[in-house]
Amino acid sequence: MIPGELFTDGPEHVLNPGRRAHTLAVVNASDRPIQVGSHYHFAETNGALGFDRAAAKGMRLNIASGSAVRLEPGQQRTVELVDYAGDRIVYGFRGLTQGAL
């Protein structure tokens, strides 16, 4: 096994099937790399990341659980976000939501 390798039951595994997805352009305006984990409320990420935060409310990265996206200083990239599932209640992170989405 290779570290980080995923074993699936078929040739292709679809992450988060049936959830609303949204694509956003994100730019790192800081002088340091910024990494965002798979389940972090994307609207509450580091303030040095430039993107439409209102469009990202209630969403997280559409990547495998436990993985992350890293943006180097000045880097712009496109990310795909998906809605949080379950009760859609968010606490913590940067403290901007603190309750129901």
Curated annotation (Swiss-Prot):
Keyword Cytoplasm found: yes
Entry annotated with the keyword S-adenosyl-L-methionine: no
Subcellular location: Cytoplasm
Keyword annotations: Cytoplasm, Hydrolase
Biological pathway: Nitrogen metabolism; urea degradation; CO(2) and NH(3) from urea (urease route): step 1/1
InterPro entries from the UniProt entry: Urease_beta-like (IPR002019), Urease_betasu_sf (IPR036461), Urease_subunit (IPR050069)
SUPFAM superfamilies: Urease, beta-subunit (SSF51278)
Catalytic activity: urea + 2 H2O + H(+) = hydrogencarbonate + 2 NH4(+)
EC number(s) on file: 3.5.1.5
Pfam families with a match to the protein in the record: Urease_beta
Name by which UniProt lists this protein: Urease subunit beta
Lineage of origin: Bacteria, Pseudomonadati, Pseudomonadota, Betaproteobacteria, Burkholderiales
UniProt xrefs under NCBIfam families: PRK13203.1, urease_beta
